[in-house]
Structure formats: structure tokens, C-alpha cells
Amino acid sequence: MIRGRIMRKFLILSMLIFTTLCGCVDFSSSNSNGYYHDSWSYNNYTSFVDTHEHYYGKVVKVVDGDTVYVEVNGELWKIRLLGVDTPEIHKRNNPYEYYLLNGTPITDTKYLKEWGYKAKHFAEKELKNKTVIIVFDNEAPKKDKYGRYLAYIFINNSNNLINFNEELLKYGYARVYISNFELKDEFLNVEREAKENRVGLWNWSNN
């Protein structure tokens, strides 16, 4: 009996210690801008959007996986999704732009083009004829040399803001396009995880 009471007390004490330790763990993450979010794409981006120049518009045309036309206040904006690059479908792909985690380039240009079309179909499914939020980055230029707007596109899914640029990386439709923008480190982390898990186009093998 005495031994049983001691064991029960030990179990209760262990549970209390575990609960206390769990309460001390911070399961959220923060970047240098101070807004908090969970890992991966389903982040709470509300603070990010609110503190950046943004507009609402309707996607009327998808050119390819990373370029869309959005109607904003009666104007038609051509938007190049910031920080990501999907394989080309209108011209030949560069076989030395997409590298696996081990440093091997995806040299099969036919394979890359196939994934370019898959990226376009994904963008059409998720964006076409939908109202989105166009968000400009504080570190990146507003337009590129071709006159296209450089921006993030956010989707409001059940009051949860989803960064579509990041979704392309998460599902292996795109690589990170290296330039100066605020979410670069996060995008690189998402890309790395997709490569580690051989998601999407990263499942290529040259065997």
C-alpha cells in the first residue's frame, strides 16, 4: 500500500512537471519583422499584410505558374510572383537553374516543362476568377525591368491568409528566385523542406 501511494505521488508529480515544461515552450516562430506565425505556409500573415502596401483584385488570367493578370480597381495589372520561379512553358528551360538538395541539377528540360504546365494548372485552380490580396514587399522593387508588378499574392481561406508564392514552393512547383525580399529566409526554408521530402519536381532522378 505504501509503495502504491509513493508510485501514485511520483506519477502526479511527473505529470505536473511535464505540464509546466510544455507551458514554457513557444510553438510559434518569429522573423525579423516581429510578426509571429507557425511553420510552413499556413501562417498568420495578417500583421504582415496590414503593415505592407496591398490591394484587392480579381485574377482574370494565368500566364504560367508565376505570372498572372489581376484586375484592380478597373485596371489590369500583370503580376510576377515575387521570390519564386516556376519552370518555363513558353521557352526552353535552363538545365542549370533547378538543383536538388545534393547539388545535382535537373537537366531534363522536357521534365521541367511538364512541371511548368503543372504549376500553371495549379495556379489556375487556386487563383483564376478569385479575389486575392496583392502585397508589395518593403525591400523589393515594385516593378521589374519588364514593367511587371513584383508582389506576393494572398488567398483568404476561411479567414486564414495563405501566401500563394509560398504554396508553390511547398508543393514543389517552384524554386526560390534569389533577390532581395523580406521573406527570403522563410522561402528558402520551405524550398529546402520540399527538396528533403522530394516533393513535386524535386522527385526527379537522372537514373
Swiss-Prot record:
This is Uncharacterized protein MJ1439. It comes from the Archaea. Gene3D superfamilies: 2.40.50.90. Keywords: Endonuclease, Hydrolase, Nuclease. The active site is at 80, 88, 148. The keyword RNA-binding does not apply. The keyword Hydrolase applies. Belongs to the thermonuclease family. GO terms for molecular function: endonuclease activity; nucleic acid binding. Disulfide bonds: none annotated. SMART domains: SNc. InterPro entries: SNase_OB-fold_sf, Staphylococal_nuclease_OB-fold, Thermonucl_AS.
